[in-house]
C-alpha cells in the first residue's frame, strides 16, 4: 500500500505545482484557470463515458481502464484545486 500512497502523493504534488505555476499552458492549468465548475463538468463527462464503456453489450476492458483513468485524473485535479490531499480519502 505504501507504494500506492507514494504514487498518489507524487501525482498530488505535481498537480499542486501546476496549479501554482500559472505560466504553464498545460491542459491541467487550463482546467484550473476555468475554475471549479469546469473541473466538475469534466468529471461529469468522464463519469458518463465510464458508465457508457461499462454498459456496452460487449465490454472492452481497455476502454473501461482508459475511461476510469480519465475520471481519476480529473478527480485528482478537483482535489488539488480545492487543496485536498488525496490521502485524506485513504484515511
Model region roles, listed by residue range:
Residues 1-68, 72-91:
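Flexible "arm" and connector segments at domain edges
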